[in-house]
Amino acid sequence: MSQNDTLRLAQEFLGRMGSDAEPTEIAKLFSETLEWDIAGDTGALPWIGHKSGRAAITDFVRDSRAMIDRITFEVHDILASDNRAVILGSLASKLKRNGKVVTTDFAIVLTVANGEIVRFQMLEDSFAVSQMARG
């Protein structure tokens, strides 16, 4: 893929997430053999940790929509190469079950091959996320 193709794929992912597209529509951007990694307190929230397969993204979309109210989600920049896009931004979310809010900067690293996302890695303030979830 070219740098522009990778950038467009990252933008399409963000667009689908922001438009409340169905989880299966979002998942079509991802490989069946997706590697999913959000470092942090595994068990605090169902999407934290290492997972494999396209179900990781559908589960994330479904679970996060059910459990979290998005307050803000701001993309500050998208950096792209032929096989990787890095989305830099900040977010604030409220956990529905306890009303706690987390505010954090983030980096989402999307690795792409053959026109689809093969690896999703999110870096955020995992300590703050854990405190919100366990709080």
Spell out what each predicted region is.
Residues 31-77, 82:
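A solvent-exposed, acidic/Ser-Thr-rich amphipathic alpha-helical stretch
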Residues 8, 52-56, 105:
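A general alpha-helical scaffold signature found inside nucleotide-binding enzyme cores
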Residues 13, 26, 34, 53, ...:
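Hydrophobic pocket/interface hotspot
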Residues 22, 56, 125-128:
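Residue-level recognition of oxygen-bearing side chains
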Residues 2-5, 62-135:
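A beta-strand edge to alpha-helix "cap/lid" segment located at domain peripheries
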Residues 2-35:
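Short acidic-aromatic low-complexity motifs
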Residues 16, 47, 119:
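Short, flexible active-site loop motifs that bind/organize anionic cofactors or intermediates
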